[in-house]
């Protein structure tokens, strides 16, 4: 899946079936995000990811993850080069190893992530 949107972003919702697990492990989730090789910045509950090798044109971030809700993680994708896909894949695999998740687009359709 190749997404290269100049002024738009794709939004995906990462939802944990067990919302109690999600709420109880938010700090652990945040630490996992901060340990990704593409992590660059945290602003409150907003986490910026960037693949510096592949996306020199994007000034600040390629993906933002928002953890301000108790029901889901909002993933806003502006650009996702291979290095970023690997980083997100690692994070999603870790989540799936700890709880059951579903990933949907903004229309509620299942995502292939």
What kind of feature is each model-predicted range?
Residues 2-113:
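Acidic (Asp/Glu-rich) sequence patches and key acidic residues
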């Amino acid at each position: 899946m190749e997404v290269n949107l100049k002024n738009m972003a794709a939004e995906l919702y990462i939802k944990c079936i067990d919302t109690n697990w999600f709420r109880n492990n938010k700090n652990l989730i945040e630490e996992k995000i901060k340990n990704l090789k593409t992590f660059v910045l945290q602003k409150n509950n907003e986490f910026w990811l960037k693949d510096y090798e592949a996306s020199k044109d994007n000034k600040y971030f390629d993906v933002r993850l928002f953890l301000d809700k108790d029901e889901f993680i909002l993933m806003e994708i502006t650009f996702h080069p291979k290095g970023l896909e690997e980083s997100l894949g690692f994070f999603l695999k870790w989540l799936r190893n700890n709880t059951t998740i579903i990933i949907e687009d903004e229309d509620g359709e299942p995502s292939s992530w």
